[in-house]
From Swiss-Prot:
Gene (name only): hslV
Family annotation (PANTHER family): ATP-DEPENDENT PROTEASE SUBUNIT HSLV, METALLOPROTEASE TLDD
Enzyme class, UniProt record, top EC level: hydrolase
Protein name (database record): ATP-dependent protease subunit HslV
The keyword Protease is annotated on this UniProt entry: yes
Family statement drawn from the similarity comment of this UniProt entry: Belongs to the peptidase T1B family. HslV subfamily.
Pfam families for this protein: Proteasome
EC number: 3.4.25.2
Catalytic-site annotation from UniProt: T5
Length: 180
């Protein structure tokens, strides 16, 4: 479990949204409260978030973005190629990290063990220490509330931040909307 962050991704009817809290913890100390752990990739057509160490995040984001470019924006192909590279590289294989990536068609959880997991519902995924809280809140809100996709992500992360001591409520989101 990564005691550093909560990232939530939601693929709704009209928008895909990723959000993350801003807390960076080191042991039992909060080092920073306004970190940004999510990114827009592929000219804003792909969103990504990271749970794990910050130094590892930059390396993995760059590696994923390069594979995304070489696959001409094909998220599925990039995710599979990324997972293969991550798994077979001696250094990267030791990283304890996870990523969420999504576009308007897919949402994937990627891990250093080679996993490429699409959520069963194809809509909601979460990682990090508050991930289960955010995931539970998002599922309940998606089923019982009529919130905009971005508000659903923000509300779910707010709930996680109120429960998980490694998650704060300084929430950042990025959105991909359907092209009109």
């Amino acid at each position: 479990m990564f005691h550093a962050t909560t990232i939530l991704a939601y693929k709704g009817k009209n928008k895909s949204v990723i959000g993350g809290d801003g807390q960076v913890s080191f042991g039992n100390t909060v080092l920073k409260g306004n970190a940004v752990k999510i990114r827009k990739l592929n000219n804003g057509k792909v969103l990504a978030g990271f749970a794990g160490s910050t130094a590892d995040a930059f390396n993995l984001f760059d590696m994923f973005e390069n594979l995304l470019q070489s696959s001409k924006g094909d998220l599925l192909k990039a995710a599979i190629d990324f997972s293969k590279e991550w798994r077979k590289d001696k250094y990267l294989r030791k990283l304890e990290a996870m990523m969420l990536v999504l576009d308007r068609n897919h949402i994937f959880l990627l891990s250093g063990t080679g996993d490429v997991v699409e959520p069963e519902d194809g809509q909601i995924a979460a990682i990090g220490s508050g991930g289960n809280y955010a995931l539970s809140a998002a599922r309940a809100l998606a089923k019982h509330a009529s919130l905009d996709e971005e508000e659903l992500v923000k509300s779910s992360l707010q709930i996680a931040g109120e429960i998980c001591i490694y998650t704060n409520t300084n929430i950042k989101t990025y959105v991909i909307e359907d092209e009109k």
